[in-house]
Amino acid sequence: VRDGRIYARGVADNKGNLLTRLQAVECWLKGAGKLPCNLRFVFEGEEEIGSPHLEEFTHRYGERLKGAVGVVWESGGKDPMGRPGISCGVKGICYVELTCRAANQDIHSSQAAIVPNPAWRLVEALHSLKDVGADRCLVQGFYDAVKAPNAVEVALLRENPLEEERMKTGWGIPAFIHDLHGLDLASKLLFQPTCTICGITSGYGGPGTKTVLPKVAKAKIDCRLVPDQRATDIASKIRAHLDQRGFRDVEMEVLSAENPSQSPVDGALAQAALASARATYGDMVSAGSSRAHAGTDVRLQPRGAGTGPMYLFHEELGLDCVSGMGCGHAGAHVHAPDENVFVEDYFAAVAHIVRLMGELG
């Protein structure tokens, strides 16, 4: 603990948020006795690798969860302006690895005149996937299932604009793609799918020179999906795209496949989460907290741009889901060695869960 912050790996994503839920229950039991509502906890430790066993769990134990008001998800925090946020959904993901092979070993680059280079072959395959200038995926049928946002969802984006200048400054970029801003920028971020190269590996990448013709080239591709796209369908479409364009030799392995999820922003759980957030952070303002922000400025957004297995609970079990009741913040440095949360934010998150239990009781 240093300068009002707790530093620890996973403290923001997401061990701290897990403990806020447990300590909120502890606070209620110690202060009032019996809980105002029934609670069930699902602890799952594989989210960072795509939750490969969670579907098996929900199929086996889903009947025990059905009938609940909904699911309070694991994440949450404040934006760069210090505003708490409530989100009712996530994007999905189709993550694949493409592999091109040539010789059975790395060989001297002088042989490039007569030996095919898998790195160039991979570049050609990648180029076929996307029109970079238009920022549009070229896989046939990629956008077919994209569901347009409703009027309420669009209104929420209009009411809660992104902190564009802070985002650009923080990332060190002069402008967003196509110089987007305002509602167009927020809509692109949350309502449109993506097709992104996450990494490319081949040959020699160390210091200085090494004249090598690589035997293999690999690329990892990440497609973030929106309702009503399906991850397995997108994977099939990518494979078909490669085959139809003469890249049958390019191997493809699906590394992660999760569907998007969207709960109603005007549902009972979302509104209870919003009301309890406004009350909690409004109290911080009244108390003169240095970490407070006006309670009425709590952001309610349709979904986040990230991914989690929320669809297993919403689409398959019929449970509304919300996230946002957490202790994170814009400078938490998630996944970095100096990951941190503010002590005051941590206890505010505990208080938020306590109030939410009261709202649902």
Regions found by a protein language model. Give the residues of each.
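Catalytic-core environment of secreted peptidases
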Residues: 1-12
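Acidic, glycine-rich active-site loops and adjacent beta-strand->loop/helix elements
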Residues: 5, 39-51, 74-79, 102-105, ...
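Acidic/histidine-rich catalytic neighborhood of metal-dependent amide-processing enzymes
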Residues: 10-89
